[in-house]
């Protein structure tokens, strides 16, 4: 296998997230649940990373830690070579990063408003973050992206509950 020369888009180094368990006694030593422990990976342009595991294995916690929705216990996260661990950057930089790095949580019913069509749910952040200057431009871009991932443009006008 050849060595990668380019900078990874996303990189995690020894990322760990632990949650304290409530103590039952004052003198009891603090215990922790290890939700994600010593996770390292690199994602290069054109690659896809799938995080697979049983329910409760820490997949969502890992994703939330990468996106700094939950602070890490230790380790580092890099986006395009820039250390973004816990988003210790300016408010403007956080806004830029959050427009470029996003996730949809595994329960689509909790992630997507059931009263808003898929196309509108995707168009809103595009318009908010300046990735489209009008609704018509956003719709055109979204329909193209739907085709790229193998979905029909008609998906734009469907509601979340219409997907299996």
Q: For each predicted feature, which ranges?
A:
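ABC-family P-loop ATPase nucleotide-binding domain
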Residues: 1-32
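The feature captures the beta-strand-to-loop junction immediately N-terminal to the Walker
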Residues: 52-53
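Helix-to-loop junction immediately C-terminal to a conserved catalytic motif
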Residues: 67
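Q-loop/switch helix immediately C-terminal to the Walker
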Residues: 107, 114-128
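Conserved structural motif at the start of ABC-family nucleotide-binding domains
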Residues: 10, 34-36, 98
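Conserved ABC ATPase "signature" region
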Residues: 83, 136-154
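Conserved ABC transporter NBD signature motif
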Residues: 75-86
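ABC ATPase NBD coupling module
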Residues: 26-29, 84-102, 128, 135
């Amino acid at each position: 296998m050849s060595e990668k020369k380019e900078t990874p888009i996303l990189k995690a180094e020894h990322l760990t997230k632990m949650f304290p368990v409530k103590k039952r006694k004052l003198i009891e030593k603090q215990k922790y649940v290890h939700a994600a422990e010593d996770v390292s990976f690199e994602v290069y342009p054109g690659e896809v990373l799938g995080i697979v595991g049983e329910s409760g294995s820490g997949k969502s916690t890992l994703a939330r830690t990468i996106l700094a929705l939950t602070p890490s216990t230790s380790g580092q996260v890099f986006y395009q070579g820039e250390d973004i661990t816990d988003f210790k950057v300016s408010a403007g930089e956080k806004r830029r990063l959050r427009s470029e790095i996003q996730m949809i949580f595994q329960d689509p019913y909790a992630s997507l408003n059931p009263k808003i069509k898929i196309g509108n749910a995707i168009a809103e952040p595009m318009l908010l973050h300046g990735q489209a200057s009008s609704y018509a431009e956003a719709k055109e871009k979204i329909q193209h992206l739907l085709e790229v991932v193998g979905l029909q443009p008609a998906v734009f006008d469907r509601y979340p509950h219409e997907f299996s």
